[in-house]
Amino acid sequence: ESDRFDYLLIESTGISEPLPVAATFDFRTEGGESLSDVAILDTMVTVVDAVNVLRDYSSADFIRDRGESLGADDKRTMVDLLVEQIEFADVVVLNKIDDASNDQLEAARKIIRALNPVADIVEANFSNVPFERILNTGRFDFERAQQHPLWFKELYGFADHTPETEQYGVGSLVYRARRLFEPTKFNQFLR
């Protein structure tokens, strides 16, 4: 249905890479269809933990070492993921600022600025951010995104690309019913 939604907010997991999400908007099927024909990618937002960003940025840990990997084959390091997320963001939410010391905040700001001098940095607690800082900003720039070294690999590697949903067994569903959803019963069912 046309004009059914004003905005669609896609929230990826903390260990996902933003570039493949953006590249999906640029990809065209064999029939010439593209997600960008029906939706506009407006803003890429990354949330960074002000307390732990310096530790993560200087870490040699693999994501799987912290129990957060997308599977046994996930060979990414914390710093690789952090760098890609910050480099590709239009807005970086520097979160947990009340928990961070002045030195931690200053180090976090410097890391973000070094990796992405054009990003809007929004300082927050509990990721409480004014909507106007992340919605309808017009900040996403496809031309700038296409300059990223991984853009062409992601976009033109789609022929051999296995979607993350298949690769990691991720699925979703939409629950619609006239009866009220009861989370307690659902949790009991899952157990």
Segments from the language model and where they lie:
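Nucleotide-state-sensitive switch-loop elements of NTP-binding domains
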Residues: E1-D80
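C-terminal accessory "lid"/substrate-recognition subdomains
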Residues: S59-R191
